[in-house]
């Protein structure tokens, strides 16, 4: 057991080092494009469709969706929780880009605004609005960042039980700071693009690993196996877990979709992506790309969470719902071999990518606000 854990840790560390070197290299490469304040904060407003779309999508989804939301709602609601991911794609991405992107880009160009506080100052001709917006952004994005750190720490401490969560937080913070300081928004956007690709690969790896688990039974039997889950004392049965509209939780499901979809419309780290798009044509492309990206990540994460009861034999792990996804993955992958270890390393990099992309956007938005 100890040898298997050592093998997993070794492969994971190698993957982390490679990932860190790529992120730093992007930061160094981007440094030459950040000679002005406009270049540092917005990449000179010349960011293309694919990079803008991935930057938006990766900022939308952090490790919180995988470790927190997908684990909690997948465990309690079942397959109906997938609608949260679908709703995020439709309302949080497609509708947001259709209604906000072009208007926001046009107004910020006209007002020459580089940040949300500057936009409020120019739009309403009020310095007080700028100060108020800056305070709100700086104060309330701090606890948001802590939630991202917590989500990532839960997964890494499962693989490295002797390393404290604080140590992982420090590593993430330092690595994010390096490429952010070096390359500003350009570095953030291009690392987001790379991290987005990693997230897509990681989600597919998660889905395959979970579905292949004997308790799940593959794509042909997962539904019938989930329907046979009995009440373990929490009053949740297979009928609830296989309801495509959330069963008794349909009201909660609707509210959650609205909160997690429309709540992002005003987040500065999301809105700033519209500022930097190079032209209207790129906005049209980015609208489609970001929607597809969100659909893959959101639906994939909640699908994995909805099958967690099968993998874990309907027993909530120690640590509660935050431990559902980490334990589901470790159980589904089984005894470590080189293949499963590499898959686990990819998934860990997925979570790291999801967190760092969100954190870099939050930090840049908070710093630029003041």
Region spans (language model):
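Membrane-interface "cap" regions at the ends of multi-pass membrane proteins
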Residues: 2-68, 180-183, 196
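Membrane-water interface regions at transmembrane-helix termini and the short interhelical loops
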Residues: 2-4, 75-77, 100-103, 154-159, ...
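Interfacial loop-to-helix junctions that mark the boundaries of transmembrane helices
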Residues: 3-15, 76-88, 156-167, 239-258
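Membrane-interfacial loop-to-helix junctions in multi-pass transporters
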Residues: 10, 47-49, 124-131, 160-170, ...
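Hydrophobic alpha-helical segments and their helix-loop junctions in multi-pass secondary transporters
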Residues: 26-33, 101, 141, 145-149, ...
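Membrane-interface helix-loop-helix modules in multi-pass membrane proteins
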Residues: 42-112, 251-263, 270-272, 276-316, ...
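Small-residue-rich segments of transmembrane alpha-helices in multi-pass membrane proteins
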Residues: 49-56, 121-126, 195-209, 292-294
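Helix-loop-helix module between adjacent transmembrane segments
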Residues: 84-180, 255-263, 351-361
């Amino acid at each position: 057991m100890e040898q298997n854990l050592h093998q997993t840790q070794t492969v994971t560390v190698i993957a982390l080092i490679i990932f860190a070197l790529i992120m730093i290299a992007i930061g160094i490469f981007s440094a030459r494009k950040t000679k002005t304040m406009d270049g540092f904060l917005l990449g000179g407003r010349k960011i293309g469709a694919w990079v803008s779309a991935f930057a938006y999508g990766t900022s939308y989804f952090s490790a919180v969706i995988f470790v927190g939301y997908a684990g909690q709602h997948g465990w309690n609601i079942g397959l109906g929780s997938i609608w949260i991911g679908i709703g995020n794609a439709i309302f949080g991405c497609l509708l947001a880009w259709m209604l906000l992107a072009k208007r926001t880009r046009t107004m910020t160009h006209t007002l020459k605004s580089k940040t949300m506080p500057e936009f409020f100052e120019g739009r309403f001709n009020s310095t007080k609005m700028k100060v108020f917006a800056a305070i709100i952004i700086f104060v309330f994005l701090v606890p948001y960042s802590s939630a991202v750190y917590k989500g990532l720490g839960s997964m890494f401490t499962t693989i490295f039980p002797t390393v404290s969560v604080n140590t992982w937080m420090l590593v993430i913070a330092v690595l994010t700071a390096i490429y952010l300081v070096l390359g500003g928004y350009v570095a953030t956007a291009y690392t987001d693009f790379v991290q987005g690709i990693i997230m897509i690969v990681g989600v597919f790896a998660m889905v395959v690993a979970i579905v292949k688990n004997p308790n799940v039974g593959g794509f042909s039997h997962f539904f019938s196996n989930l329907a046979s889950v009995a009440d373990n004392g929490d009053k949740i049965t297979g009928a609830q877990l296989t309801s495509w509209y959330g069963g008794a939780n349909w009201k909660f499901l609707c509210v959650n979709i609205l909160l997690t979809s429309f709540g992002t419309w005003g987040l500065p780290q999301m809105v700033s992506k519209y500022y930097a798009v190079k032209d209207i044509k790129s906005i049209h492309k980015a609208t489609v790309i970001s929607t597809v990206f969100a659909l893959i990540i959101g639906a994939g994460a909640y699908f994995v969470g909805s099958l967690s009861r099968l993998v874990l034999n309907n027993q909530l792990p120690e640590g509660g719902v935050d431990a559902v996804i980490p334990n589901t993955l470790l159980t589904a992958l089984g005894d470590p071999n080189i293949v499963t270890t590499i898959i686990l390393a990819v998934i860990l990099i997925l979570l790291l990518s999801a967190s760092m992309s969100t954190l870099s956007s939050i930090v840049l938005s908070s710093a630029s606000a003041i």
